[in-house]
Amino acid sequence: MSNLMDKHTQKIDPQSLQHMLSVLRLEQLGDLKLTNVSLLDLINGEVIPGPILIDKGHIIAVGQEVDLLAAVRVVDCHGQIAVPGFIDAHMHVESSTMTPFEFERTTLPLGTTSIVCDPHELVNVMGRQGIDWFLRCSETMHQNMFVQISSCVPAVAGLDINGSDFSLDEMAAYREHKHVLGLAEVMDYPAVINGEQAMQDKLTTFNNLNLDGHSPLLSGLSLSAYVACGIQNCHETTNVEEGKEKLAKGMAVIMREGSVAKNLDALAPLITDFSSPYCLLCTDDRNPHEIANEGHINFMVKRLIQQHDIPAYLAYRVASWSAAKHFGLRRLGLIAPGYRADINLVSTLDAVDIQRVLIAGEFVDELTLESELEAKLEASSPPLHNTVKHRPITEAELTIPLKEGEYRVIGVVKDELLTNHLVCHFDGQHFAEPGVNKLAVIERYGHQLPPALSLVKGFDIEQGAIATSVGHDSHNIVVIGADEKSMAHAVNHLLEIGGGFCVVQQGEVTADLMLPLGGIMSLERSEKIAEQISDLKTAVKAIGVSLSEPFVQMSFLSLPVIPSLKMTVKGLFDVDQFKFVSLRVDS
C-alpha cells in the first residue's frame, strides 16, 4: 500500500544526500550560494539574515553558518528576501484552458512552484485517458504538479450524462504513483453522509492518503458526519461562520480566489496565529485573462497583506507551509535545511513583488520553458480527438412553450458559484421581472438527446446568445440567449469548431475561442488565450451582459452539487432538496 513518504519531493536520493553531507563537512562545493539575502522564517514569524546554500536541489544551510561553506556558483540577491514557493492547494488545470506545460510556463514565474490539481474535468470527458495524460505531463514538468484522483466522475451518478465513468478499480490503480497524493474533492456529500457503500469503498481505498472535500454550506450533524468519514478539507467555504465551524471540526479551510468564486475577502478574518496551519490558498478555476491581469497565488498573498492587514508571515505561511503540512509534503514550504529549494525572491514582504523564482535550486528565468514546451507536449501524447458530437440543433428544439403562470428560474449571483432558486411570473407575453433569458443544456457525447430547457436570470442578454462546451463537470454544451435562432447558431458553431466559447449577435459569431482538447482546453499560448478571452468579454458586453466572467459563471450552471438550482441534460435540479423539479411551478 502506498504512503505519502513515497511521493514526489518527499525523498532525497542516497547519492545526493551523501554529497550534501560532504558539503556540510567542508569537503566539497555546494551548487549555489545566495548572498546579500535574508529569509522569512515562517515558524517563528521573523526575517533572519542569510546567506542560503543550495545543493542537489535542496537547501542545506541558512544564516551565518553558510559563511563557512563554498559553492560552485554565488549569486548576489541585492538585499532581497527569500520566501517559500507558493502552493495552490486545489485547482483544475483544465479550467485555465491551458495545457499543464503552458500553465507551468505562465504561473511558475509568478511564484507558484507547486499545484495540487484534480483533473476531473478531462476525466469526465474521456475517463482514465485524462488522468494518464496529466501524470505523463507531471513526470517532465519543473513545477511540482500533484494529481489527485478524481473521486466523483460523474459528479453525482444519475444526475447527468458525461463522457466516461471512472470506477473504483481504475481509481485504485493510481495510488502508488509518486505524483498522486490522494482522493480529489468528494463532491457527492449525500453519498458520504448516508453511508452509501460505493462511496465508503472509495474512502477506505484511499484512507492512508489525503481525502479532499467539497461541502458548500454543510453544517451541524451533516458536516460532522462528513468529517467523521475522514474528509480533511474544503475549498467551497464562503463565509466566516461556515469556516469557523469547519475549522473547529478539524477541517482545513482552503480559501479560494478563482475567476468567479472569489471568497478570499470574506474568509480573510479566519487567519490567525492559531488557525493559520489549517488555512490554505487555492485558485480552483482561474483563467489566463485573470492570471495575466492580477496574478495567481501571489495576488492572493498581496491582497491578504495589503487589503486585510494580515501579518506578512501569516500570509506567506498559508500560501506555502500550511499546504505542505496539510498534504504531508515534508520537504516543501519552508526555507530550511533539507527542504526543496523552491524559493521566491521579493524586494519587500508587503509588496509581494517577485523578482526571481527558484524551483529545485534552479532559477526559473534560466530554464527553457518556452523552447521545450512543444516537444514536451508532443512527447506527452495529448488525447486529442473529437469529443463534441451532436447533430445540428434547430430553433424549434430550443423553444420553451411558455404559458401564463409561475416558473422556476436559476438566479445567478455575481462572483459566486451558488445560485438562487427564483420563482418568476409569466403573464403570457413577458416575465414580471426583467432580465430572464432562455437556457439550454445539450448532451455532446453522441447520444443525440434533445436539449434540456430552462430559464436563467442574471446574464441580462438583450440580443443574441453565448455558448460554451465547458459545463462543469460533465462538460455538455450550455447556451444562454434572448432568442432561439441565436442560440441554435451559437451551439452549431461550437459543434463545427470542436468545442469552446462563442458569442452570437445579429446572426454573426462576433468572438470565439476554440478548445480542441476534449472541448475544454486550448493548445495556444496563455497570452493569446487571454487576448481571445478579452475579445469575448467585449462581445458579451455588446449584447447586454454585465457579469465580469460570464463564461466561467455559466459553466457552473450545470453542476448539481453546488446550491441551489442547477440544470443538467436531464432537467432542472434542486440541489437543496436533491431532486429534479419541473420548470413550471404548478406542473
Swiss-Prot record:
GO terms for biological process: adenine catabolic process. It comes from the Bacteria. Keywords: Hydrolase, Manganese. Its EC number is 3.5.4.2. InterPro entries: Adenine_deam, Adenine_deam_C, Amidohydro-rel, Metal-dep_hydrolase_composite, Metal_Hydrolase. The keyword Hydrolase applies. The keyword Nucleus does not apply. SUPFAM superfamilies: Composite domain of metallo-dependent hydrolases, Metallo-dependent hydrolases. It is an enzyme of class 3 (hydrolase). GO terms for molecular function: adenine deaminase activity. Its cofactor is Mn(2+). It catalyses: adenine + H2O + H(+) = hypoxanthine + NH4(+). HAMAP family: Adenine_deamin. Belongs to the metallo-dependent hydrolases superfamily. Adenine deaminase family. This is Adenine deaminase. It comes from Shewanella halifaxensis (strain HAW-EB4). The lineage of its organism: Bacteria, Pseudomonadati, Pseudomonadota, Gammaproteobacteria, Alteromonadales. The gene is ade.
